[in-house]
Amino acid sequence: MGSEMCIRDSIKVNQEDNGMDSSEIKQLQILATKARMGAILGTFCAKSGHPGGSLSAADIFTYLYFKEMNVDPKNPKWEDRDRFVLSKGHCCPSLYAVLALKGYFEWDELTKLRHVGAMLQGHPDMKGTPGIDMSTGSLGQGISAACGMALSAKISNKSYRVYSVLGDGEVEEGQVWEAAMFAAHNKLDNLVIFVDQNGLQIDGTVDEVAGIEPLDKKFESFGFEVFKIDGHDFNQIEDALNKAREVKGKPVAILAKTVKGKGVSFMENQVGWHGTAPNKEQ
């Protein structure tokens, strides 16, 4: 697969529509499937990486870049672009695939994932990868960077919005909640965070390691508007993001229930695929 996989503006950003028709949903599903294929390709070629969480978040990445965010792949550093921070940075393979599909770089770069000197590293690198707005990897830190971007927009009277995706295991980190307090205190209504709730982390289930529920009430108590969705349902993703635009004076948390390893039958809901690359037979 080469440049023919690049789909730059096939789905236009439209904040005024009244829902997607079946053809739009089908196109998003096709793009998300290609993103999952890219994540598998990249981790296979690298012989390392994190396919499970990459697959669970692929639908969210796809919707954001092809339907929600105002970005320009030909000008990745455009000052007025919407920003995206992948706080769970280890799940970048499917994000890289979405960026390739959007036209930030060639699809073949995925075959060099994690190679020394390659454009695409094991965690997002804002200096080396077009389309990456923040270098991440140490869990819990991305939301702080997203808060800074959102506050900068407010101070500069800019209209861009900031989006971030966190893992559910990641919200066990204390820094997440410090940043959440900051976001609410500063009334960052231009900030939307997704929590990818696939229920698994490297050491087992999230409930076993350090239960985080009731997560909705926790974010609400910190001053967030909260929406709960199926993270694989594009209609629900769209509805939550449309509602998020109507929220004033507070940040938004979208709690997205997902399946770790989504789309690959033997990977789904299996903690072992958190950080294991597939082999040729698989």
How should these model regions be labeled?
Residues 1-7:
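Short, small-residue-biased leader/transition segments that mark boundaries at the very start
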Residues 8-14, 18-21, 70-80:
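Nucleotide/pyrophosphate-binding catalytic subdomain
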Residues 19-35:
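N-terminal hydrophobic or amphipathic helices/low-complexity stretches enriched
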Residues 32-48, 196-198:
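N-terminal capping segment at the start of a domain
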Residues 39-42, 54-178, 184-185:
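Cofactor-binding active-site loop characterized by glycine-rich and histidine/acidic residues
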Residues 90-91, 95, 198-199, 233, ...:
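Glycine-rich beta-alpha junction loops
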Residues 131, 135-138, 143-246:
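Thiamine diphosphate
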Residues 234-282:
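Glycine/aspartate-rich loop-and-adjacent alpha/beta segment that forms the canonical ThDP
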